Amino acid sequence: MRRPFASSAAGTAGVRVTAQTTDQDRLPDTGASYGQRVALYFAAMFVIYGVLIPFLPVWLDGRGLTANEVAIVTAVPFILRLAVTPAVAIFADRLGAHRLFIIASAWAAFAACLLLGGMNGFWPILAVAAPLSLAAATMMPLVEAIAVKGVRVYALDYGRMRLWGSLSFVIVGLIVGAWIDRSGSEAALWIMLVGTMLTVVAAHALPYPPAATRDEETSNAPAASTITRDVLRLFSLPVFCAFLVAASAAQASHAMFYTFGALHMRAQGISGAWIGALWAIGVLAEVALFAVAGTRFRHLQPETLLAMGAAAAILRWMVMTIDPPLQILVPLQLLHALTYGATHLGAILFVARAVPERVSGTVQALYATFASGVAMGAATWASGPL
């Protein structure tokens, strides 16, 4: 695949997004620590996601919101990302302050989660749940930029860092599902509060930029006009636009399942424990993909991974339309490894190969904005009446 930018940092081979650095370029004795702290943050952050994605609709339903109101509360943060996520990413790239913005977002999520427990009724819940979801979503592209920095400087394996987030999601899903069966939907909020606290701690433990690049980033930080010009140049390239459309469509196909999947399965008589287990099965499949991607898929191109994700999504959601029994839901959930995992890996690999490092965070945010903002928000909003 040709690079849109001739000046972009050295690309990587295969899905194991590894940098082509020499031994002289690498910084000794710090790469492992860098990767461990990023992995720790992924694990903490995904405690929030492990409640927010599958079980926030269950909590909203328990607070008496209608299906349309649940869809709106879930969709509004996606829409707000259109402005907030790119703006934060541009400032983070301009200032070289991804870590600082992550810390601020983590504290905002913690404060919103504290307030949410006292909210009742559609408007008060929307006023607090939307900032909570937005803060949680804003953290993802910022920490992805930090992870990609580790890939480029220390030749770290992105999948090995990211899989700890997926494992955290699995464990939390199992705990929340079982706890809801015993104690009701309010249990979800308590675990999410713990998740926000852990995320605050992990955010403060995130690594600073590698020493070899910190001074360079400070002295040669791109002007906002330079970042804007680079981003506009990307949008003029058909390959970048095709990437955004493909990745966004594949990710948005999950919208109705994320919003109403748990509620629909409960209506079918599936227990909370089994709902948590089904989510766990899907994410474990994703973990397995991340774990082997660096060795098994190293020769695959980003577009191949995106095509695999899209094809699996067509099969998965077509079968889901017939309300399959539990024994069919289990293998269907295994397809999550492709519908989400392969799509996401393809997107991360595309960014690592095709864009300059100076706008990496901004492009990560653009991907998140279009995939998890425009496309996911529209699909989520539409799922309410359906």
Model-derived features: where do they sit?
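Symmetry-related core transmembrane helices of the 12-TM Major Facilitator Superfamily/SLC fold
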Residues: 187-205
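Intracellular juxtamembrane helix-capping segments at the cytosolic ends
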Residues: 137-152, 342-356
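Hydrophobic core of transmembrane alpha-helices in multi-pass small-molecule transporters
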Residues: 43, 112-116, 122-141, 146, ...
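Helix-loop boundary and gating motifs at the non-cytosolic
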Residues: 25-78, 239-278, 344
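Juxtamembrane intracellular "pre-TM" segments in multi-pass secondary transporters
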Residues: 21-33, 207-246
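Loop-to-transmembrane helix entry/capping segments in MFS-fold secondary transporters
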Residues: 67-68, 152-164, 272-273, 355-368
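Helix-to-loop junctions at the C-terminal end of transmembrane segments
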Residues: 83-97, 180-181, 288-302
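Structural signature of the two symmetry-related core transmembrane helices
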Residues: 100-114, 304-319
